[in-house]
């Protein structure tokens, strides 16, 4: 199975909990026996994986909304993981693989005033769209499990 993992947010960022989670997930995936394709921005700071894809330096808005989804479509993985930031909104068009975002918390819903511009207008809409999809799936599965009792 071909699995891509978005590690583009690692470039130029301080390593906090979400970044460390993404690195740990990536390293665990390497032991899975699957073809793992890490996607980096500017450089691979983690290892010498020959399957790594490096997106050249660009504006973060352009990277997260156009270049990343174009790169993923070109790779055509069966699964793509987003362990740090949500997937680009346009990824749903023309991509046949499965998309798995990571929800670290929902503080962005309650504390919107504390968010910077990028978080308000990039993260929040993307996370809400993904969360809405996941909630529909969860409710459907919950109802299905209740009906089978």
Which ranges hold each PLM region?
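Carbohydrate transferase catalytic cores enriched for Leloir-type hexosyltransferases
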Residues: 1-149
């Amino acid at each position: 199975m071909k699995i891509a993992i978005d590690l583009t947010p690692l470039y130029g960022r301080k390593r906090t909990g979400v970044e460390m989670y993404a690195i740990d997930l990536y390293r665990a995936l390497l032991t899975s026996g699957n073809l793992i394709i890490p996607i980096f921005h500017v450089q691979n700071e983690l290892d010498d994986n020959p399957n790594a894809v490096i997106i050249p330096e660009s504006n973060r808005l352009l990277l997260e909304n156009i270049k990343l989804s174009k790169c993923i479509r070109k790779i055509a993985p069966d699964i793509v993981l987003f362990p740090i930031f949500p997937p680009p909104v346009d990824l749903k068009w023309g991509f046949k693989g499965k998309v798995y975002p990571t929800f670290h918390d929902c503080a962005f819903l309650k504390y919107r005033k504390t968010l910077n511009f990028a978080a308000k207008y990039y993260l929040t809409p993307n996370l809400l769209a993904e969360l809405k999809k996941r909630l529909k799936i969860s409710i459907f599965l919950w109802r299905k499990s209740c009906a089978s009792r």
